[in-house]
């Protein structure tokens, strides 16, 4: 057995009786300074240990989200109707997706970007429309030509006023004209405007009555609107919306639609019967947006190759006057990749202040077609996108903290001979930025901490010894002189 006496002999820290030690004011002051300096260096070392240390590298894109990329957007068009707003995607590989509706929502807005109705569903407006057989036979005008003055008077006089807003240069308006005039004559014979007085079919030439067409937010030709009791506005759960007809444009379909509108109305009192219910004859009537603007929001999935996201007016059975199209828009949100929660993004910005500065470059910006640009103006955005990924090596394993796509944006306006559009041209970089978080080891922190405390203690002891010996030497010299 090892005796306690022998064990004590290896003690590195032998104690000196307190009675044999001497305290001094200089030693006390130096001890206080040393203690404060230790605390300061300890705080600095702790801050350095807790600080995120990163390395940045540029590598070939190794995205975990495959060959497709998600684009989220929320864009407001003050002068583009939801009736015709279309979201299209194309790329250099030949992909062309027109009028995407599955992941896109449209809401009518006013010129001040305020919502004016519920979500607009354009399914009925986009089916293949039957115009009947083309014929060169001319029919007598059955529909009444309307002007701004006569429109107001007749819309207040007839319970039902069905109006065809058209343009003479429009191919689809000319296709509709024979069927429309024939149907108008049939309706006039069945429901005499003077004797019956329940319904009237009219025409508005938008080249001669542009103010009337603009007031009714006509953007595509022909547009068939139904006006009830002096106004095309109907109350529906707090939202005012007008009715538009999107059905077939042959004579029989138009007559059937009008008869379905007239059926619930009493011929003498011109009041809607209490048991009047909608039926299949009016199934192609749809409440349209009351204002001429539209907020388009949602997302699309695109291939990771250069491509275009295009928002424009589109219809397979309407024509548009390109000189009157205004593609001004305000971008509320536009981003690439999966949506990042605000909390996660806030945490990452706290750790990495330079992260997330360019993932929403277009957000909150307005692109307005000023008058000096003239007509037929397309607004283009050129977006160059690069992926940034942050990974950590804590707990001995490497895992991804966040993935985001940042982009630069350059915008311009250009006059075109074609229909104006809002185009977002995106080009993805084949490289990605990899930010690696390298945590410091706890053993390294403890080692530095011991070095700091021990070093300060030792240096303070040396300084105290030098000062004490110097004072003693000075006293001895003074004592020798006195002798």
UniProtKB/Swiss-Prot annotation:
Domain (Thioredoxin) spans: 133-263
Which SUPFAM superfamilies would you find in this protein's record? Thioredoxin-like (SSF52833)
Name the membrane topology term: Single-pass membrane protein
Gene Ontology MF term list: protein disulfide isomerase activity
Q: Which protein is depicted? A: Protein disulfide-isomerase 5-3
- Transmembrane portions of the chain: 442-462
What does the protein in this record do? Answer: Acts as a protein-folding catalyst that interacts with nascent polypeptides to catalyze the formation, isomerization, and reduction or oxidation of disulfide bonds.
Q: Which UniProt keywords are present, listed alphabetically?
A: Glycoprotein, Membrane, Signal, Transmembrane, Transmembrane helix
Active site residues according to the UniProt entry: 170
Tissue localization of expression: Widely expressed.
Q: Which family does it belong to?
A: Belongs to the protein disulfide isomerase family.
Give the GO biological process terms.
Answer: intracellular transport
Report disulfide bridges, numbered on this chain.
Answer: none
Where in the cell?
Membrane
Which Pfam family, an example, fits this chain?
Answer: COPIIcoated_ERV
Q: Which organism is it from?
A: Arabidopsis thaliana
Gene that this polypeptide is encoded by? PDIL5-3
Would you tell me the Gene Ontology cellular component terms?
A: membrane
List the glycosylation sites. 53, 74, 99, 279, 326, 376
